[in-house]
Amino acid sequence: NMLAGRNSNDAYITGYKHLNPIKDFHSPQRTQDVSEEIYQHLLQGKIVILDLSVGDPDQRTRLSKIIAQHIFKRSMQTFNQGEFPPNIMIYIEEAHNIIGNKDNLSDTWPRIAKEGAKFRIGTVYATQEISSVHPNILANTENMFVSHINNENEVRVLAKFYDFADFGPSLIRAQD
């Protein structure tokens, strides 16, 4: 029994401790994959808020990616069947903790940034660490609201994608 941490011979289950960090993300009451449940809510036009502010950072990143990948695949399937996928907006707070800057271009977040609009998926990501966001995502960002960037390096990273030469000094001086 996984919950007891022992097998039918009452010996400890090998590897059980490796599953402990993800125990809080599971429930015996679940009847379907949480990614599909979220997608079904989105199909109904509902707002889904997934608070992943607590827990193991690796698990938060992994779960976010799994859910985003599911949304992307389902929307792409709908589009490929000649139907219109639902309008979906994904909002990522503290994006530098979720979207890695070293992902492959075929990974979930860069693909959503590059192809998501075709499948009616928009993305809003909030971060103060622009340099930690994948460059392909920055290159495919159409609109930016920039405030409270008090680091010259972050402004330089932003300037690689957009002309912030006129605004850089004022962005650094600006305070909340």
Per-segment meaning from a language model:
Residues N1-K114:
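P-loop NTPase motor domains
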Residues I112-D176:
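Conserved ATP-driven motor cores of ASCE-family P-loop NTPases powering translocation/secretion/packaging/pilus
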